C-alpha cells in the first residue's frame, strides 16, 4: 500500500500527462496486466466520480487496468450503496 500523499502525487502526474496528451497507457498493451488481475486486484486509489461518459477516471488520471477502484454516480448525490462501495474498498485494499 502506498501513502495517500503518494497516491495523490501519482494521480496528479497522470492528469498532467492526460492534459498534455502524453498518456503512457494508450501506447502500451494492457495484455500484460490482464492475467494478474484475474487473480486479485490491488488499486492504489479509490475514486468517487461522475457517471458522465466524458469523464472516465482511468483516462483522466492516465492509469492502467487495476490501478483505480472507481465508483461512479450520477447527480453528485452519494447514496448508501456508494458509501458501501467506498467502505469495501478501504477495508479490502
Task: Indicate where each model-derived feature is located.
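Long, non-catalytic terminal segments
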Residues: 1-38
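Conserved active-site and cofactor/substrate-binding residues in soluble primary-metabolism enzymes
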Residues: 2, 6, 42, 55, ...
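Short HxH-centered metal-ligating active-site micro-motif
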Residues: 4, 59-93
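Divalent metal-coordination and catalytic microenvironments
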Residues: 11, 47, 71
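Fold-independent oxyanion-binding glycine-rich loops
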Residues: 14-15, 21, 50-52, 73-74
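N-terminal short beta-loop-beta anion/metal-coordinating cradle
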Residues: 26-66
Amino acid at each position: 500500500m502506498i501513502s495517500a500523499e503518494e497516491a495523490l502525487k501519482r494521480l496528479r502526474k497522470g492528469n498532467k500527462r492526460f492534459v498534455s496528451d502524453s498518456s503512457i497507457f494508450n501506447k502500451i498493451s494492457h495484455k500484460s496486466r490482464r492475467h494478474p488481475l484475474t487473480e486479485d486486484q490491488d488499486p492504489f486509489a479509490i475514486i468517487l466520480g461522475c457517471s458522465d461518459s466524458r469523464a472516465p477516471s482511468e483516462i483522466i488520471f492516465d492509469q492502467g487496468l487495476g490501478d483505480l477502484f472507481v465508483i461512479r454516480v450520477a447527480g453528485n448525490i452519494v447514496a448508501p450503496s456508494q458509501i458501501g462501495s467506498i467502505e469495501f474498498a478501504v477495508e479490502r485494499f
